[in-house]
Swiss-Prot record:
HAMAP family, alphabetized: N_acetyl_glu_synth
GO biological processes: L-arginine biosynthetic process
Transmembrane found in the keyword field: no
PROSITE patterns for the chain: GNAT
Species name: Actinobacillus pleuropneumoniae serotype 5b (strain L20)
Cellular component, GO, one term: cytoplasm
Name of the encoding gene: argA
Gene Ontology molecular-function annotations: L-glutamate N-acetyltransferase activity
Name by which UniProt lists this protein: Amino-acid acetyltransferase
UniProt-listed InterPro entries: AceGlu_kinase-like_sf, Acyl_CoA_acyltransferase, Asp/Glu/Uridylate_kinase, GNAT_dom, NAGS_kin, NH2A_AcTrfase
Taxonomic lineage of the native organism: Bacteria, Pseudomonadati, Pseudomonadota, Gammaproteobacteria, Pasteurellales
Subcellular localization: Cytoplasm
Keywords: Acyltransferase, Amino-acid biosynthesis, Arginine biosynthesis, Cytoplasm, Transferase
Catalytic activity, as annotated: L-glutamate + acetyl-CoA = N-acetyl-L-glutamate + CoA + H(+)
């Protein structure tokens, strides 16, 4: 990374550093993630999150390590409804696998980067289990489910600046140990902690569409369709499928955002959390983007967006004072608290006309549909004002507006006030859209 790229990334990440401080994240790590060579980088990034004031709970699984140990001991186990049936001999193997991973996680988190503080990593026995029992005539043996979680205990450990680590085995009130799905543990802890995020590492960079592209944002309703596809194709054991189910449940229970990332790519955790667009798949009941009317609090963001375009001569220069006076005219698209697009609607009621002005989209989003989204929002505002004709003045984007129904016009077609202030030095093209009202 060149110095300029580093500086730019660092500046862009600053709002997210402030946004995430003092927040609580639950991180899900399956056995494949822990066994992967990139795990050392994941733990370094977890340590970085902790140093930024983020409260962390790590819940890990050991499915692949259990399978390896069973094969090594010439043993096997069966599944029913995607849950391992655990007898007493299998449980001993589970304990061995989980214990080894527990040690690996602690040792990795204890490996400090130069000049970084020692991390306070603690193990938690906050989960109390109970047997699954007999379902459909199948005895699950020592496979269990959650009976109770000592959330107060976890909260106390987090308040003491600890990273809390929880594995997939837990005791019952009778002292027996049970094997639990770690995804269930992570999901329920996130829900009961009222965590801000649930983050899952899987073997692909989130959820992919039919063409293999990462879906950056998913509503839980859409996510259910992808989960169904996993199940119908026999891929429920795929880590992405299990994490997707956990994320859907978490979103429905009030967790604002869940993220699915690849454990194979170095830095995926940081890229997902500290950049506008992330790198994996985010599940949320609400979109990370919001289109709304601007307020005075948006003026700094508006200035950051339009200043470069003013300097290039694409937009007419506007002072801060002018923006303050006209702020109610502006519609903005906001992404994670950052203004990425804007447009103003200037009304001329006598002529039943309005101007779409100061149209700006952040460079990172110009190849997307944000311009169309803004135009539709401006048209809706114009309809409410009973505007019959919407016009624009532009020096660079004539063709874009023509493709959307605007027709080239002359100054004679402008409202009287606008015609009197037309800048003949700038010689902007005039385009008008008949709204048909």
């Amino acid at each position: 990374m060149r110095n300029t790229e580093l500086v730019q990334w660092f500046r862009q990440s600053t709002p997210y550093v402030n946004m995430h401080r003092e927040k609580t994240f639950v991180i899900m790590l399956d056995g494949n993630a822990i066994a992967h060579p990139n795990f050392i980088n994941i733990t370094n990034d977890i340590g970085l999150l902790h140093s930024l004031g983020i409260k962390l709970v790590i819940v890990f699984g050991a499915r692949c390590q259990i399978d390896e140990l069973l094969a090594k001991n010439q043993m096997s186990s069966t599944y029913h409804k995607h849950i391992r049936i655990t007898d007493s001999k299998t449980l001993e193997v589970v304990k061995q696998a989980v214990g080894g991973l527990h040690y690996d996680i602690f040792s990795r988190l204890s490996l400090r980067l130069p000049n970084s503080p020692v991390l306070n990593v603690v193990s938690s026995n906050a989960v109390l289990a109970q047997p699954l029992g007999v379902i459909d005539g199948v005895d699950y043996g020592l496979s269990g489910k959650i009976r109770r979680i000592n959330i107060e205990g976890i909260q106390q450990q987090l308040a003491q600046d600890a990273i809390v680590v929880i594995g997939p085995i837990a005791p019952s009130v009778t002292g027996e140990m049970f094997n639990l799905p770690f995804e269930e543990i992570a999901t329920q802890i996130a829900i009961k902690l009222k965590a801000d995020k649930l983050i899952g590492f899987c073997d692909q960079q989130g959820i992919l569409d039919s063409e293999g592209n990462v879906l950056s944002d998913l509503h839980p309703r859409e996510a259910k369709r992808y989960l169904t596809q996993f199940i119908e194709s026999g891929q429920y054991h795929h880590s992405a499928a299990r994490f997707l189910q956990a994320a859907i449940e978490a979103c429905h229970a009030g967790i604002k955002r869940s993220h699915l990332l690849s454990y194979k790519e170095d830095g995926s955790l940081l890229q997902e959390l500290f950049s506008r667009d992330g790198i994996g798949t985010q599940l949320s009941e609400e979109s990370s983007e919001n289109i709304r009317l601007a307020t005075s609090f948006d003026i700094p963001g508006l200035l950051n967006l339009i200043r470069p375009l003013e300097e290039q001569g694409i937009l007419v220069k506007r002072s801060r004072e002018q923006l303050e006076m006209e702020i109610s005219n502006y519609t903005i698209i906001e992404r994670d608290g950052i203004v990425i697009a804007c447009a103003a609607l200037n009304h001329y009621p006598q002529e039943k006309m309005a101007e779409m002005a100061c149209v700006a989209v952040h460079p990172d989003y110009r190849d997307s549909s944000r311009g169309d989204v803004l135009l539709e929002a401006i048209k809706r505002r114009a309809y409410k004002l009973q505007v019959e004709k919407l016009f624009v003045l532009t020096t660079r984007t004539t063709q874009w507006f023509q493709e959307r129904g605007f027709v080239l016009s002359t100054t004679d077609d402008l409202p009287k006030e606008k015609r009197e202030h037309y800048n003949y030095q700038r010689m902007s093209k005039i385009l008008i859209l008949d709204l048909g009202q």
